[in-house]
Structures are given as structure tokens and as C-alpha cells.
Regions:
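N-terminal Rossmann NAD(P)H-binding glycine-rich loop of SDR-like oxidoreductase domains
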Residues: 2-29
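NAD(P)H-binding glycine-rich loop region in Rossmannoid oxidoreductase-like domains
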Residues: 9, 50-99, 103-106
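SDR active-site strand-loop-helix element
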Residues: 12, 38, 76, 113-119, ...
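Short, polar loop motifs at secondary-structure junctions
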Residues: 37-44
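Conserved Rossmann-fold NAD(P)-dependent oxidoreductase catalytic core, especially the SDR/UDP-sugar
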Residues: 79, 87, 95-137, 142, ...
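Oxidoreductase cofactor-interface core, primarily capturing Rossmann-like NAD(P)-dependent enzymes
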Residues: 123-225
Length: 230
């Protein structure tokens, strides 16, 4: 829950497609009083906010004191499921996420850890990305902290944000009209990175948020939280 100065948010993955939209939502939201980003390199956070530079997130535990005093961690970092080998995908998606989460649980046992997972995440899935995300969800839920798993389907970039991955840029550029249409007619399959940020902020402000939030509910929560003037 927010203090008098608004929510204090720690963000990971600020330079990625999801994180860019989430950062923008935080910077625009009157509910957010302070935004900091856990980054590997300076300059990863665009716009207002403070950066906490940690070169290797696997060793963030030694600096857990820097994570103290936040209301929620929005964990948006990850590897693209396309073109990433399984060992690397597991290292980034599970191992690094859990390293940050353990440090977070030490520094903020009452704070919320909101993890951007994916639709269909299941530790028993035959699809490698969904299986590893499912394993990560189970491990996060076992830690001594409040956690929320958000499971977006497709995520489209809006408001000038985009992917850094060269292989995916043509897909997002060419598929933008179809993705926008899908978001309108099939909210259970598609959301935007800005809507994801709006939903994260709304959930962080709840005293008892749900443990798992599917794509349609992400859009519903974002719609209810959105400023009509924005």
C-alpha cells in the first residue's frame, strides 16, 4: 500500500518492450510517488526516475539494502522466447528472477513482488518458454513475500516504445495494425505495454491483490485505472 507520498516502485527491465511501457505508466501516474529502476547499465531508464546499477543481477543479494523502502517491485525483465537457447532462457527467466526476488524478500518482506509472466505459463507445459515461466511462478510463490503473477498474451508497444531486438522489430512494425485490432476484439489475447503498467500500479495499490492475473483481467484493471484525460 502507498504511503503519503504515493507508491514507491522498483522496476526491472526498464529498457525492454514491456518495461518501457511500465516506466511510462509510472511516470504519468499520480499514484506513483517515486520510481527507481534496477539496471545493469546506466541510462537504461528513459525519463524521470532513479537508477540502481547492478552489473550482475545474480549477485544482487549483497546489495539488498538498496531495495529497502519500496512498496512494490515490478519485475519486467526477461529474454525473448524467439531465438534464445533453453539454457540462457532458463538463466534469465528463472535464475536471475529468483535472485532478485530473494533480495527483495529480504529487504521488503511486506512489499509486493509483481512478476510479468505470460499467458499459458505452466511448469508441466511442453513448450519451453511456458514451462520455465511456470517453474518461475511456483518458485516465486514459495518465497516469504506477497507475489502477483501477471500473464499477458501478446504485448504491443505504444506511445513511442518498442523492442530492442533486431529479429523482432519487423514483426512488431508490420503487425502493429493487427495487434491493435486484436487488443480491441480479443482482450484475453492481447494487451499493450502501457496498459500492463497501469494494471501493475492498480494492483500494487490493493491491500489484497489476486495471486494470478490473466490477460483479460489486465486489460479490465487497466481500463478502470486509466485517467480519462490521458
Amino acid at each position: 500500500m502507498a504511503g503519503k507520498g504515493g507508491l514507491r516502485i522498483l522496476l526491472t527491465g526498464a529498457s525492454g518492450l514491456v518495461g518501457q511501457g511500465v516506466a511510462l505508466a509510472c511516470q504519468r501516474s499520480p499514484q506513483v510517488g517515486h520510481l527507481a529502476a534496477l539496471v545493469r547499465r546506466p541510462g537504461s531508464l528513459s525519463g524521470a526516475g532513479r537508477e540502481l546499477v547492478v552489473a550482475d543481477f545474480l549477485h544482487v543479494q549483497g546489495r539488498s539494502d538498496e531495495q529497502a523502502g519500496f512498496d512494490a517491485c515490478f519485475y519486467c525483465a526477461g529474454a525473448p522466447p524467439v531465438g534464445t537457447a533453453e539454457a540462457e532462457y532458463r538463466r534469465v527467466t528463472r535464475d536471475i528472477t529468483l535472485a532478485v526476488a530473494r533480495a527483495w524478500a529480504t529487504a521488503n518482506p511486506e512489499g509486493g513482488f509483481l512478476y510479468v509472466s505470460g499467458a499459458g505459463a505452466d511448469p508441466q507445459s511442453r513448450l519451453m518458454p511456458l514451462r520455465i515461466k511456470g517453474e518461475t511462478e511456483v518458485a516465486l510463490q514459495a518465497l516469504p513475500m506477497r507475489s502477483v503473477m501477471l500473464r499477458p498474451g501478446g504485448v504491443r508497444p505504444v506511445s513511442g516504445t518498442g523492442t530492442r531486438h533486431g529479429l523482432l522489430k519487423p514483426l512488431y512494425w508490420g503487425g502493429a495494425p493487427l495487434m491493435k485490432l486484436a487488443g480491441a476484439v480479443a482482450p484475453s489475447l492481447m494487451t499493450s505495454n502501457l496498459a500492463l503498467g497501469q494494471a501493475l500500479i492498480a494492483l500494487a495499490g490493493e491491500e489484497h491483490p489476486p495471486g494470478t492475473v490473466e490477460c483479460a483481467d489486465i486489460n479490465r484493471i487497466a481500463s478502470g485505472a486509466r485517467d480519462p484525460a490521458s
